Design a protein with these regions (language model features):
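Intrinsically disordered, low-complexity segments enriched in serine/threonine/proline/glycine
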Residues: 14-17, 37
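C-terminal motif of bacterial Sec signal peptides marking the signal peptidase cleavage site
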Residues: 22-25
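N-terminal compositionally biased, intrinsically disordered segments and leader/signal-like regions
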Residues: 8, 31-34, 50, 138, ...
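Extracellular calcium-associated, cysteine-rich motifs in secreted modular proteins
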Residues: 47-82
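Bacterial signal peptide processing site
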Residues: 27-29
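Intrinsic-disorder/low-complexity signal
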Residues: 76-204
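Repetitive, low-complexity intrinsically disordered regions enriched in Pro/Gly/Tyr/Ser
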Residues: 33-51
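Bacterial N-terminal signal peptides that target proteins for export
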Residues: 2-15
């Protein structure tokens, strides 16, 4: 299992403040809302590529971490949940990539703590070739209703523990964020083994 002392140490170590790593681009208001809360565009970490929106109304979802059919939800019908807030990570190698979403209360949802008191859930934890199941390489965190107001932070980590060496090499990832029935953003980043980075921060 990857639930090792090394993992605990990683979670406890100092990480540069997320907002300090974000691009300096202005954060602009969108027309959408999540519940009664105004949604603003996420701030994106340096080196993260913003994916230009590309979807087709009525298209089949491809289970790729994107909204393929323009309905504001990510990968519905792919075996994991949507909600008033959804963060979905996808990749296409045998790597074991982990998604971390920290809510405004400071609780982090990830494989070692898959629910939060604010109502967040990790309902799909993929281990790539480390899991041996052949399951889809997707991780998904969602709030079905009433996500708390405040700033959310999203990080990803390429697990490279001694219990599983996949030799998957650098792995491109896609991450999308949906709130209140609209896509806030979609992002690409290529991780290397044992790398953990902040991807985005966004307020609701």
């Amino acid at each position: 299992m990857k639930r090792s002392v090394k993992t605990i140490g990683l979670l406890g170590m100092a990480v540069a403040p997320l907002l300090a790593l974000m691009s300096a681009a202005c954060v602009t208001r969108t027309a959408g809302t999540a519940g009664s809360t105004v949604v603003v565009q996420p701030q994106v970490a340096s080196g993260v590529t913003v994916v230009e929106a590309s979807c087709t109304p009525g298209a089949q979802e491809q289970c790729n971490g994107l909204d393929d059919n323009c309905n504001g939800a990510i990968d519905e019908g792919c075996g994991y949940s949507s909600g008033q807030l959804q963060v979905t990570l996808a990749w296409n190698t045998g790597a074991d990539i982990d998604l971390y979403v920290t809510d405004p209360n400071g609780e982090t949802i990830y494989y070692g703590s898959n629910t939060s008191s604010s109502g967040g859930h990790l309902d799909h934890d993929a281990r790539g070739n480390c899991g041996g199941s052949g399951a889809a390489t997707v991780e998904n965190v969602f709030w079905a209703n009433n996500p708390p107001r405040g700033t959310y932070k999203v990080e990803i980590h390429y697990w490279a523990g001694s219990d599983c060496s996949t030799n998957a090499g650098p792995t491109p990832t896609t991450l999308s964020i949906s709130a209140g029935g609209r896509i806030l953003g979609a992002y690409n980043y290529t991780l290397v083994p044992d790398q953990r980075i902040p991807i985005a921060a966004f307020p609701l």
